[in-house]
């Protein structure tokens, strides 16, 4: 058989959310920043994303990242995040997955009891620390990018749920944060269809009404998803949240960048003190922890540096081929 492309991946999940790491088979990516490399991929090789994220190799809620060379002196590697709709600016669960794989598979020099991993992402440089006992990787904590409330108490009108009020905050991506209780939206698997409809309608309305732009990275200029918070199932958790992002994807994890934005939102509203920990529960009951490390500014705006902690596990290795004779080789989505 004639194979037009072969791609190798490491399959990881973070709190239940898939993350497919592409380790080989990509074309050489031109550009001296991750954002420019991402732009080249989007224009010249987007079929790779479709092949790996869409069915039959992936599914409507698939997520992944392409390894690339670092662009800053303190980074071990760079990453370009991909999903069903396109490309994202940040992915906290992806950072945790990448850091776990880097330590488990020896991509970085490992030290006990903790190993540092530096990652260049579209949103900037991210530093992670992985617990390492000499045999196994444990929980990962990463220093998030500066995070902040962009706009408070904004309202959007939706077709199915009426007026929805919340905050737009940034934790590596812009999200619309809303309380699900007034809309009878528990963060449970049984409510996932209503959560998807709600999140998609709010995201569309917010993007139409409230233009956003990162003060220092103008390429980050859209609301990536809706984060719906409600009561957790575990009394030890602070809250549960469900992130509906991209093209109606549902995050199985508590959302890493979303946790960073939530920490900033709560801190800047006086609802989370320095030294306090947000225990953030996902739709499947897994947990990330978030806390404020320090205050900072971004383009003159008050912001904080959050730390986010979670765990990931390698669940497989794969080799994928692209066969141009296959009419579905670049994938499809039923939903």
UniProtKB/Swiss-Prot annotation:
Q: Give its E.C. classification number.
A: 5.1.1.-
Q: Where is the active site?
A: 91
Keywords recorded for this protein, A-Z: Isomerase
Which reaction equations make up its catalytic activity?
A: trans-3-hydroxy-L-proline = cis-3-hydroxy-D-proline; trans-4-hydroxy-L-proline = cis-4-hydroxy-D-proline
Q: Which domain of life is it from?
A: Bacteria
Q: Which GO terms describe its molecular function?
A: 4-hydroxyproline epimerase activity
Positions contributing to substrate binding: 92-93, 251, 256-257
Family per similarity comment: Belongs to the proline racemase family.
- What's the stated role of this polypeptide? Catalyzes the epimerization of trans-3-hydroxy-L-proline (t3LHyp) to cis-3-hydroxy-D-proline (c3DHyp) in vitro. Can also catalyze the epimerization of trans-4-hydroxy-L-proline (t3LHyp) to cis-4-hydroxy-D-proline (c4DHyp), albeit with 3.6-fold lower efficiency. Displays no proline racemase activity.
Protein name, per record: 3-hydroxyproline 2-epimerase
Q: Which organism is it from?
A: Burkholderia multivorans (strain ATCC 17616 / 249)
């Amino acid at each position: 058989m004639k194979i037009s492309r072969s791609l190798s991946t490491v399959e990881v999940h973070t709190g239940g959310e898939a993350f497919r790491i592409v380790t080989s088979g990509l074309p050489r990516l031109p550009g001296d920043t991750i954002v420019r490399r991402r732009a080249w991929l989007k224009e010249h090789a987007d079929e790779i994303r479709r092949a790996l994220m869409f069915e039959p190799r992936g599914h409507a809620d698939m997520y992944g990242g392409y390894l690339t060379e670092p662009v800053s002196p303190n980074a071990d590697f760079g990453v370009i995040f991909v999903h069903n709709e396109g490309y994202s600016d940040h992915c906290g669960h992806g950072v945790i997955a990448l850091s776990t794989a880097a330590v488990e598979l020896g991509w970085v020099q490992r030290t006990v009891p903790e190993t540092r991993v530096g990652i260049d992402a579209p949103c900037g440089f991210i530093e992670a620390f992985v617990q390492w006992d000499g045999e196994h990787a444990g929980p990962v904590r990463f220093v998030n990018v500066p995070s902040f409330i962009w706009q408070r108490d904004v309202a959007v009108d939706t077709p199915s749920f009426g007026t929805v009020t919340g905050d737009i905050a940034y934790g590596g991506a812009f999200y619309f944060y809303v309380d699900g209780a007034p809309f009878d939206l528990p963060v449970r698997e049984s409510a996932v269809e209503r959560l998807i409809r709600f999140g998609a309608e709010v995201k569309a309305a917010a993007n139409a009404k409230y233009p956003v732009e990162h003060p220092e990275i103008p390429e980050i200029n859209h609301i990536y998803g809706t984060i719906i918070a409600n009561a957790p199932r575990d009394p030890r958790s602070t809250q549960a949240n469900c992130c509906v992002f991209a093209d109606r994807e549902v995050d199985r994890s508590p959302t890493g960048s979303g946790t960073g934005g939530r920490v900033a939102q709560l801190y800047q509203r006086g609802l989370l003190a320095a030294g306090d920990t947000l225990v953030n529960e996902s739709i499947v009951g897994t947990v990330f922890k978030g806390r404020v490390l320090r205050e900072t500014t971004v383009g003159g705006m008050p912001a904080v540096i959050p730390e986010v902690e979670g765990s990931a596990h390698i669940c497989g290795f794969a080799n994928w081929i692209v066969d141009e004779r296959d009419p579905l080789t670049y994938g499809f989505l039923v939903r």
